[in-house]
Design a protein with these regions (language model features):
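Hydrophobic alpha-helical segments typical of transmembrane helices
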Residues: 10, 32, 55, 110, ...
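Active-site metal-coordination segments of metallo-dependent hydrolases
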Residues: 28-31, 130-131, 191-194
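Short phosphate-engaging motifs
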Residues: 28, 106, 156
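Catalytic core of membrane glycerolipid acyltransferases/transacylases, capturing the structured
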Residues: 93-153, 180-182, 190
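Non-catalytic C-terminal accessory region of glycerolipid acyltransferases
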Residues: 42, 47-53, 89-92, 116, ...
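Membrane-anchoring hydrophobic helices of lipid-metabolizing enzymes
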Residues: 1-101, 136
Length: 267
C-alpha cells in the first residue's frame, strides 16, 4: 500500500535508503565479510563498502518492486532483452530448455520476460523462511511472473520432470547452497552446488541457457540470454555443473554490487 501511494520511482528511493541504513543494523555482517574475503582473493582491489551498500539498496528496491509486478508484466519499457532471437528459436523448436541464473538485480524479471514471450515455463523456487509472508509471495509469483511454481525438494523434482514431459521449459536459480548438492569449486572454494540442471540436461538431452540480469542506473533491467550449453559437449555431468559455476562467477564479477552476499554460500 505504501509503495502504491508513493509510486514506483519514489518507493525505490525510500526502500533503497531504508535497507541501506536501517536493515544492516539488525543483520550480522560476518557472513557478508567472509564471502567478500573469498571473492577478493579472485578479484583483488574491490570496494567492499560500495558493494555492501549497493547490495542493500538493490535488496530494498527488489522488495518494493513486488508491489509493482503488474506494471512490469503489462509493459516492455522497463526491460531490455539481449539475444532475444534465442527465445524465438526455442519457440520454433518446441523443445524445452533449462534457464539458469542467480539472484541478481530483480531476479524475478527473468521468468516474467520468458513467459511474456509465450514460452511454456515452470519455475523452481525456494520458499521463504517467513511463513506469514511466503503465501503472499507465492500468490504474486503465480499471478504476475509464472503460474507454474515448483517448490524446491524431492517432490519438486518429480513435478519438474512432469512439466518437461509436457514440453515446458524450466527456470531456476543456481547460486545458493543446497544440502543435497555436490561440493564444486566456486571462486576457488568448494561449495555445495545444485546438480539438478546438469542431471536434467543429461537425462533428457536438453540445452541449458544461462541468463544474466542487471539493473541499470535508471533502474530499468537488462536480461541477457547467453549461449546455450549442450550436454553432449561435456563428458560427465560434473563437468557441466563446474561450467555453470564458472559462468556464474563471471556474472558476479561483472556486477558484484547486485548479487546477494548475505547468503552463506560456502558453509
Amino acid at each position: 500500500l505504501v509503495g502504491r501511494l508513493l509510486g514506483l520511482k519514489i518507493s525505490r528511493i525510500v526502500f533503497a535508503s531504508f535497507f541501506s541504513f536501517i536493515v544492516p543494523l539488525f543483520r550480522s555482517k560476518k557472513i557478508i565479510k567472509e564471502n567478500l574475503n573469498i571473492f577478493s582473493k579472485i578479484t583483488p582491489n574491490i570496494n567492499e563498502t560500495e558493494i555492501i551498500d549497493s547490495m542493500w539498496k538493490n535488496y530494498g528496491m527488489t522488495f518494493i518492486e513486488y508491489t509493482f509486478l503488474n506494471y512490469f508484466k503489462s509493459k516492455n519499457s522497463y526491460t531490455t532483452i539481449k539475444n532475444e532471437n534465442l527465445l524465438s528459436q526455442i519457440i520454433q523448436e518446441e523443445k524445452p530448455v533449462i534457464f539458469v541464473s542467480g539472484h541478481f538485480a530483480n531476479f524475478e524479471i527473468m521468468s516474467m520476460e520468458i513467459t511474456k514471450k509465450k514460452i511454456p515455463l515452470a519455475t523452481i523456487y525456494r520458499p521463504l523462511n517467513n511463513i506469514f509472508l511466503n503465501p503472499f509471495m507465492e500468490y504474486l509469483r503465480k499471478k504476475y511472473i509464472c503460474k507454474n511454481q515448483i517448490k524446491k525438494g524431492i517432490n519438486g523434482v518429480r513435478h519438474t520432470i512432469e512439466y518437461l514431459k509436457k514440453k515446458h521449459c524450466i527456470a531456476l536459480m543456481i547460486d545458493q547452497r543446497v544440502s543435497e548438492g555436490e561440493k564444486i569449486n566456486f571462486f576457488g572454494q568448494p561449495a555445495l552446488t545444485t546438480t539438478l540442471p546438469a542431471q536434467l540436461s543429461t537425462k533428457f538431452n536438453l540445452d541449458i541457457v544461462p541468463v544474466y540480469i542487471q539493473r541499470d542506473k535508471y533502474h530499468n533491467f537488462l536480461v541477457e540470454f547467453k549461449e546455450r550449453l549442450n550436454p553432449s559437449d561435456f563428458k560427465i555431468k560434473l563437468e557441466l555443473s563446474e561450467e555453470l559455476n564458472r559462468i556464474l562467477e563471471k556474472m558476479i564479477i561483472r556486477n558484484p554490487n547486485q548479487w546477494i552476499w548475505t547468503h552463506n554460500r560456502w558453509k
